[in-house]
């Protein structure tokens, strides 16, 4: 069981607009990937998280399966969205318990007036505790312990998607989003295409 990524995003103001979710803070654990793969894999985790955060409406929880990975996404009514990327073995309930904890704490530390109108994130919006959490909560039992002080999670309200294609808008293709992405370097785009051809398990897509 493994957590690879925890991130907090500002949700788009309107779901129908071209605005993307804005990553406010994140942490990654790429230790299981080869040294030369880590940069490209890290970029794709951010790209994947941004893509699903942009397409998750306020109040919605959805888990998006892609390859060997699952992105757990929770968009809050306050205008922020949490994303947790794990392997397929990490249980759903602890994943959302951790996301809820992260978002609760983020809103206390960073009220909406700090990030509602910004055009780019900055270091003042980071959440240092994420580094602790991505280590501590590799053990799902630790996250389950939070349940004692949080309300019960209704797992039936979590939407499970078998592939990221299911959350894309009609007519959108993942390959096209990769090509148009400004957050991915040319080498990472090439890495994605090669990994897709070989069905490599070392890449997030």
UniProtKB/Swiss-Prot annotation:
GO cellular component, one term: autophagosome membrane
Domain Longin: 7-131
Chief place of localization: membrane
Membrane disposition: Lipid-anchor
SMART domains: Longin
Compartment(s) where it occurs, according to its Swiss-Prot or TrEMBL record: Cell membrane
Lipid modification (S-farnesyl cysteine), residues: 202
Propiece span(s): 203-205
Protein name as catalogued: Synaptobrevin homolog YKT6
Originating gene: YKT6
């Amino acid at each position: 069981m493994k957590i690879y990524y925890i991130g907090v995003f500002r949700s788009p103001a309107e779901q129908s607009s071209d605005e993307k979710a804005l990553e406010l803070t994140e942490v990654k654990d790429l230790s299981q990937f080869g040294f030369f793969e880590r940069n490209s894999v890290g970029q794709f985790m951010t790209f994947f998280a941004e893509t699903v955060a942009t397409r998750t409406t306020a109040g919605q929880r959805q888990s998006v399966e892609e390859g060997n990975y699952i992105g757990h996404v929770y968009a809050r009514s306050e205008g922020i969205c949490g994303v947790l990327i794990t392997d397929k073995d990490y249980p759903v309930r602890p994943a959302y318990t951790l996301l809820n904890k992260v978002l609760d704490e983020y809103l206390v530390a960073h009220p909406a007036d700090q990030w509602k109108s910004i055009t780019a994130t900055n270091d003042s919006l980071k959440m240092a505790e994420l580094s602790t959490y991505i280590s501590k909560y590799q053990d799902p039992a630790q996250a389950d312990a939070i349940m004692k002080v949080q309300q019960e999670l209704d797992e039936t309200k979590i939407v499970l998607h078998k592939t990221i294609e299911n959350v894309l808008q009609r007519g959108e293709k993942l390959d096209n989003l990769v090509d148009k992405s400004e957050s991915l370097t040319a080498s990472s785009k090439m890495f994605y295409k090669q990994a897709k051809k070989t069905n490599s398990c070392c890449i997030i897509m």
